[in-house]
Amino acid sequence: SGLEVEVVPSTFKADDLIARFEAKEIGGIFLSNGPGDPLTLINEKEQVQKLIGANIPMFAICLGHQMLSIAHGYDTYKLKFGQHGGNHPVAYNGVVEITAQNHNYNVPDNIVEIADITHQNLFDNTIEGVKYKNKEIFSVQHHPEASPGPHESKYIFAQFAKIVK
């Protein structure tokens, strides 16, 4: 995709990234996956809220997807049964993608107040992806980066690259 990626720790300071965005040193932020209960990540929530307020384009997966929801004021909830494995069907634009998943938490249905649902889990109808209204921010719950696969969701990275170039 021709992008240069720089990894920053989870202890990042939003003000530093905002300054770099305003100086055109970075074109966007990717919030990655990770372990644990997203509601316990108070500092990270505050930092993501600052990034949202700065209108920086963002793409997130799994824990990052959950953090965007929480930072927008929509708390996640724990699933009765976590979703784990490499064969979870997800609907996107009338197409079924087979996805890799590994999570115990999900974003709430009322996120539709501020985001459009882009991906839906076909096992339990939980939300698998959203695009925030009037923002260049989108996210998915599953793992499009999964290797060795499945790879049906790789297009998501190209969508983000198009926004940040």
Language-model features, listed with the residues they occupy:
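Short helix-loop-beta junction
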Residues: 1-8
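Short acidic loop-to-helix transition motifs that present clustered carboxylates
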Residues: 8-17, 37
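Hydrophobic anchor at the start of a short beta-strand
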Residues: 5, 58, 137
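A glycine-centered loop/beta-turn motif at secondary-structure junctions
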Residues: 129-165
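Active-site glycine-centered loops adjacent to acidic/histidine catalytic or metal-binding residues
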Residues: 62, 103, 143
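Structured helix-beta-strand junction loops
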Residues: 1, 24, 54-55, 113-114, ...
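Catalytic beta-strand/loop cores that center a nucleophilic Ser/Cys/Thr
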Residues: 95-135
